[in-house]
Amino acid sequence: MRVLYIIAYDITDARRLGQIRYFLKGYSTGGQKSVYECFLEREELKFIISKIKRLINPNEDRVHIFRIDGRSKVITLGIAVPPIDPEYFYIG
């Protein structure tokens, strides 16, 4: 079962920043700059955590992963759209 996670990061090095941004875009259904909405299976989450641990410098970088309860009401403002778990993902 897919669960919605918000992954936010603050990476100090431009090279590492690019690597993490490129990696997370493959799993995200939405987001903006350094915050991504990702619907993940448990194994995908484990893989993402292990990959990010290898990419970051733990003394300089910061990554937060928030599990969003599906029963919670989503409030959107402005042109924001509520996150939707897509039926299919395109990888290519």
Swiss-Prot record:
Protein origin, superkingdom: Bacteria
Q: Which UniProt keywords apply?
A: Antiviral defense, Endonuclease, Hydrolase, Magnesium, Metal-binding, Nuclease
Organism phylogeny: Bacteria, Pseudomonadati, Nitrospirota, Thermodesulfovibrionia, Thermodesulfovibrionales
Enzyme Commission number(s) = 3.1.-.-
Which Pfam family, giving just one, matches this sequence?
A: CRISPR_Cas2
Has the keyword Magnesium been applied to this entry? yes
Q: Would you tell me the protein name for this molecule?
A: CRISPR-associated endoribonuclease Cas2 1
InterPro entries hit by this protein? CRISPR_associated_Cas2, Virulence_VapD/CRISPR_Cas2
Gene Ontology BP terms: defense response to virus; maintenance of CRISPR repeat elements
So what does this one do? CRISPR (clustered regularly interspaced short palindromic repeat), is an adaptive immune system that provides protection against mobile genetic elements (viruses, transposable elements and conjugative plasmids). CRISPR clusters contain sequences complementary to antecedent mobile elements and target invading nucleic acids. CRISPR clusters are transcribed and processed into CRISPR RNA (crRNA). Functions as a ssRNA-specific endoribonuclease. Involved in the integration of spacer DNA into the CRISPR cassette.
Which species does the entry assign this protein to? Thermodesulfovibrio yellowstonii (strain ATCC 51303 / DSM 11347 / YP87)
One annotated GO molecular function is:
RNA endonuclease activity
Subunit structure, briefly?
Homodimer, forms a heterotetramer with a Cas1 homodimer.
- Reported cofactor(s): Mg(2+)
Record-annotated residues binding Mg(2+)? Answer: 10
Gene3D superfamilies for the chain: 3.30.70.240
Q: Which family does it belong to?
A: Belongs to the CRISPR-associated endoribonuclease Cas2 protein family.
